């Protein structure tokens, strides 16, 4: 089974969270950035609030839980930034029955390093095998499928 997520490149150096959410909901990164980026950067909007505003059903995790990447769906993950010293970076990992796929929104920006699934970066100078990350939230494949097909979604608990 191929991934449901379509890669989008973040249009500015600090828009990885908004771009990851845009990939999840199938909207343009620029639209989501215009709608949510500044309040998020200012600390007036949390990732949880962003997910809820977008109607995304998810399971949240504490970094102490260290959940395995076993269930099919999309994992919203925080990893160390490869391009901003001391910074964090948001990526997506989609798990399907045929493996896992890493979607790094910085991929494609000039001279920016980006994460790839282990063993997939060989010979690509800017591609770095993904090592450490923390799972922030998990979205079931069924929820993504329903969103994309226009099926009615179950009400999201606040």
Describe each region flagged by the PLM:
Residues 18, 79, 118-119, 137, ...:
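Generic alpha-helical secondary structure signal
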Residues 31-129:
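Conserved active-site-adjacent core of cysteine acyl-enzyme catalytic domains
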Residues 1, 70, 134-137:
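Contiguous, function-dense segments enriched for cysteine-driven chemistry
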Residues 123-158:
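Charged phosphate-binding loop/patch that engages nucleotide di/tri-phosphates or the phosphate backbone
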Residues 5, 17, 25, 74, ...:
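Extended aliphatic helical segments
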Residues 2, 15-18, 28, 62-63, ...:
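Generic serine detector
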Residues 1-56, 152-158:
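Active-site nucleophile-adjacent alpha helix/oxyanion-hole segment immediately C-terminal to the catalytic cysteine
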Residues 3, 114-117, 142, 146:
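Hydrophobic transmembrane signal anchors and adjacent membrane-proximal interface regions, especially
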